[in-house]
Amino acid sequence: VIKNITDAPIRVQKREKEEVYEEAKKLLTKMGLADKADAYPYQLSGGQQQRVSIARALAMKPKMLFFDEPTSALDPELTGEILKVIKDLAAEHMTMVIVTHEMNFARNVADKIIFMDKGVIAVEGTPEEVFTSEHGRMQEFLGKLSVE
């Protein structure tokens, strides 16, 4: 796991190995995985693997993160782990673009939501504007979900 996180910053960004390893350890602690530094990815749960991938991305010090359905392949019981990590990143003002069907999560974390229908932006705005939109397709979509 630690090598998985440190490889790109060392090889691509040519950063100092010691600095990168220290940062990776901090990222693993932040992800709740400090005890997994020497584990192999196959020894981790899906949620743990996803958190390692987020740590790997953060190790590159990006200005923005992109997530495409970050919880879709996870056991429902592990979804909360990933949503908490993303929520914590939002609280730290990390800019993120997240494609998700986790509508309650989007409502609570996003400062802007874009709802797309058939590849076209149908509704965009603040969570309040989007979730109270009178747009027919938006209402139909929300009606099929249990959004509080």
Where are the regions a protein language model picked out?
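Conserved ABC ATPase signature
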Residues: 40-44, 48
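Catalytic Walker B motif of ABC-type/P-loop ATPase nucleotide-binding domains
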Residues: 65-68
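A short, surface-exposed alpha-helical micro-motif characterized by mixed small hydrophobic
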Residues: 106-108
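ABC ATPase "signature
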Residues: 124-125
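A short, proline-enriched helix->beta-strand linker immediately N-terminal to the Walker B motif
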Residues: 59-63
